[in-house]
A protein has these predicted regions:
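Short amphipathic alpha-helical segment within the helicase RecA-like ATPase core
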Residues: 1-248
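A generic structural signal for tightly packed, nonpolar segments enriched in small/aliphatic residues
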Residues: 28, 41-45, 181-486
Length: 486
């Protein structure tokens, strides 16, 4: 199969304009493609397709996809590069049509941006069907022509990184337990000589005095793991690393503060923070990015049992602060509190944590963007600029003292794990809670609860767990590796 792009005609130009690959193919079939397009309905709109069979012996089926305006660039209103997004969406829908025809290979027009085209193809074809007997046919996307093969390959690596997090998030919680999560990541990193993976057991966690993390883990029969990854891509192994921290709750029932049963199965993806940061490191290693990265993922389940945290219990975090656990379902911040304390051991250039932390984040921004709470404008600028390119957007949220007061005003301990006014500003009080465990001057907390899954909002992702914002983290790390400022 073959997927070719076509731009929508500007008002006066009349005939729609092919990409250069589309033009070349049209010449190859003596203008037949343009002729067929002109007689088979209105001009192709952005994201719409036409499919033609039997035009050329090498390509039994050719899908023409609408790319929208030719010179679409950064859209200030939308905070993304519209041209790139249009290519991703169009290529994804074209590749899926080839897949529906059970054609095993598809060649993709680079559409002027081979990286975006590769991302659209690889992300658009991904589906989790490991556990089904009846599987969709596997389709391998390849670049049509050889002009932009380096950019294409980069796009494939970026997209495979996001697909790895989608896989980890989508898989059932009895398949991706804390131990199996860690083993899966270790196996992905085994071939890189500049990566060390430490799978720390419960006994190690206890010696580190991570009392908040352990208090959550003790409710489950699954043993907790603290996963620590060292990627040494920098010129000097002693260069200050970028530290990623990801919440790794492989299943979140809520604990004694039990969640409603409807939709609880989606909580198999409550390790989305760990999945995205670990996948970003796997991708950084595949791209051989020239910087050092450390990944930290506290992994456990949050379950109700005779051993579980009870509402009102007080636990002690690694830095000695005590926390009153007023709601056992605000557990992600307990794991992150200890992991953030530990992250300060590495003289980090920046600490970036990701977590499916609060339903309130989903209420605030929905799935349009990841909420970013940060104490560093320098860090924010890098994350924001990266997100414009990837189309996986971020939006800055407040870290006001206003919210800190609501978590420090606590009857029995230094901090309460939910804000004084419970639901009001829930994403912001959670961020304020985390800030109590951070002394680093460049720290960002990404609340990814709203972007955890995709219904149909992102056209190049199928319905299911989204693996967002993995590509933005990778692009951010790539930009950081070029920035000597700090």
């Amino acid at each position: 199969g073959l997927v070719l792009g076509i731009y929508s005609s500007e008002k006066d130009e009349g005939a729609a304009q092919f990409t250069s690959a589309g033009d070349a193919f049209d010449r190859l079939v003596s203008g037949k493609l343009r002729e067929l397009l002109s007689v088979c309905g209105p001009p192709l709109k952005k994201g719409k397709t036409r499919i033609f069979h039997g035009l050329h012996q090498d390509f039994p089926s050719v899908v023409v996809v609408g790319l929208g305006k030719k010179n679409a660039g950064v859209n200030e209103q939308e905070n993304w590069n519209e041209g790139k997004e249009n290519i991703r969406a169009a290529v994804a829908v074209g590749c899926r049509q080839i897949q529906d025809l059970e054609i095993p290979c598809v060649e993709v027009d680079p559409c002027g941006d081979a990286q975006a085209a590769a991302e659209g193809a690889v992300l658009g074809l991904h589906e989790y069907n490991e556990l089904k007997q009846k599987k969709k046919p596997v389709v391998t996307p390849q670049l049509h022509g050889s002009a932009e093969s380096e950019a294409w390959q980069k796009g494939v690596i970026y997209a495979e990184g996001q697909n790895l997090s989608r896989y980890l998030m989508e898989a059932p919680a009895n398949y991706i337990t804390p131990v199996k999560f860690a083993e899966h990541i270790e196996q992905k990193l085994r071939s890189f000589s500049n990566v060390k993976v430490h799978i720390r057991p419960e006994s190690w966690i206890a010696t580190q005095q991570m009392g908040a993390f352990l208090s959550v883990a003790k409710g489950s029969a699954e043993p907790p793991i603290f996963l620590e990854i060292h990627y040494l891509g920098g010129a000097n192994t002693n260069d200050s690393p970028l530290v990623f921290v990801g919440k790794g709750v492989t299943f979140d029932s809520g604990g004694i503060s039990l969640k409603p049963s409807s939709g609880m199965d989606a909580m198999r993806a409550d390790m989305g923070g760990a999945a995205t940061v670990c996948s970003a490191i796997v991708t950084a290693a595949a791209l051989n990015l020239p910087l050092n990265i450390i990944g930290l993922a506290p992994l456990c389940e949050n379950m109700p049992s005779g051993k579980a945290n009870k509402p009102g219990d007080v636990v002690r975090a690694k830095n000695g602060k005590t926390i009153q656990v007023d709601n056992t379902d605000a557990e992600g911040r307990l794991l992150l509190a200890d992991a953030l304390c530990y992250a300060h051991n590495f003289n980090a250039r920046a600490i970036v944590n990701a977590a499916t932390l609060t339903g309130a984040m989903d209420v605030a921004l929905g799935s349009a963007a990841t909420g970013v709470f940060t104490n560093s404008s320098w860090l924010w600028t890098h994350l924001y600029e990266a997100s414009i390119l990837t189309g996986d957007r971020v939006w800055r949220m407040p870290l006001f003292e206003h919210y800190t007061k609501q978590v420090t005003d606590c009857p029995l301990a230094d901090l309460s794990n939910i804000g004084k006014y419970s639901r009001a500003g829930g994403a912001c009080t959670a961020a304020a809670f985390l800030k109590e465990f951070v002394t680093a001057s460049h720290w960002a907390h990404l609340d990814i609860a709203g972007v955890m899954s995709n219904k149909d909002e992102v056209p190049y992702l199928r319905k299911g767990m989204a693996g967002r914002p993995t590509r933005t983290l990778v692009e951010f790390a790539a930009r950081l590796s070029q920035d000597s400022h700090n």
